[in-house]
Amino acid sequence: MLKKFIEDIEHHFEPGGKHEKWFALYEAAATLFYTPGLVTKRSSHVRDSVDLKRIMIMVWFAVFPAMFWGMYNAGGQAIAALNHMYAGDQLATVIAGNWHYWLTEMLGGTIGAEAGVGSMMLLGATYFLPIYATVFIVGGFWEVLFCMVRKHEVNEGFFVTSILFALIVPPTLPLWQAALGITFGVVVAKEIFGGTGRNFLNPALAGRAFLFFAYPAQISGDVVWTAADGFSGATALSQWAHGGSGALINNITGAPITWMDAFIGNIPGSIGEVSTLALMIGAAMIVYMRIASWRIIAGVMIGMIAVSTLFNVIGSDTNPMFNMPWHWHLVLGGFAFGMFFMATDPVSASFTNSGKWWYGILIGAMCVMIRVVNPAYPEGMMLAILFANLFAPLFDHVVIEKNIKRRLARYGK
């Protein structure tokens, strides 16, 4: 019945129809439920029914474990901090002055010390969902606008860009900054260069980089990671950068942060970056379906392990980051998220198999170098991936030229 309705109204959106200019929106909605009706005129090159939309939706689903854990963790961190700082009437006053808090209680949750998993998820959702909705609406507007101007269908890559961007920002990010960031990512880093398939930079990371340099106070520092009014606490990566492994403590309880705490995600940070375990679950899904390249992931790990081990051997009495072992680099900051979901972006990464190895190795090595050597910015994954994006075409060019020369030497005579 739904398919018949879609087919009955299709002629209104085709060239000459009364809704011709809205074809991009119609096509996006129709292909959300059914595969396109287009067929090839000559020998078909289609191997199966999985198209771009299905691939992007699978990536969208793959980040759900990290997204749900991120909402739970953001809410849990905020509730613990609030109950640590306030009590009684003072806590009630704080709740009444923040719409996230009173909305959580209005929906049946609680901000008190007795809060359960549901209340933590609910509070985290009041922070994440508005950011995601803002990013989706604003970014979707630009996507549809460019599609209407260029007269082609809406590219499904924005489904992934929108949720990835929303997951790599702090839960306290102002909504207007989220709108600015995704605007920069979609318009400047993607559409100006031709749209999906033609951008050489990762749009989500480009948008975050714009916010980092334009509004550093809302995207970094000690006050943006825990959604509790009046609370300040550094991320685990910043703690290590300033005091080594001994400085890793829970900002609320003062208890030491263990490797397992960081691996599971019981630490403050960007919404989707805190749980390496949840990220691994999603990554296993897209690697199994061959959407993400295992070569890139392996290359990132090789580069990270090699350079971090080198710094461990060199050592330093003044810079604690020299002594961070590779297994801590893996679980702190945005390394795991970047390795699994950003570095493997098929558009901005290298295409050739050999190029993927070198592309991944460069990312892992650059991430550790930025973390260790840069005194002002302990995180390095974002800049490392954007830097490697610039070199991805060069890697492919070198690999292709080398293959051509080898074949000419073999068969040219």
From Swiss-Prot:
Modified residues (FMN phosphoryl threonine): 235
Main localization category: membrane
Gene Ontology MF term list: FMN binding; oxidoreductase activity, acting on NAD(P)H, quinone or similar compound as acceptor
Transmembrane segments annotated in the record for this chain: 55-75, 128-148, 163-183, 267-287, 296-316, 324-344, 357-377, 380-400
Enzyme class: translocase
Reaction equation(s) it catalyzes: a ubiquinone + n Na(+)(in) + NADH + H(+) = a ubiquinol + n Na(+)(out) + NAD(+)
Membrane topology: Multi-pass membrane protein
GO biological process: respiratory electron transport chain; sodium ion transport; transmembrane transport
Any one cellular-component term (Gene Ontology): plasma membrane
Top-level taxon: Bacteria
Subunit structure: Composed of six subunits; NqrA, NqrB, NqrC, NqrD, NqrE and NqrF.
NCBIfam families: nqrB (TIGR01937), PRK05349.1 (NF003756)
Protein name, as recorded: Na(+)-translocating NADH-quinone reductase subunit B
Name of encoding gene: nqrB
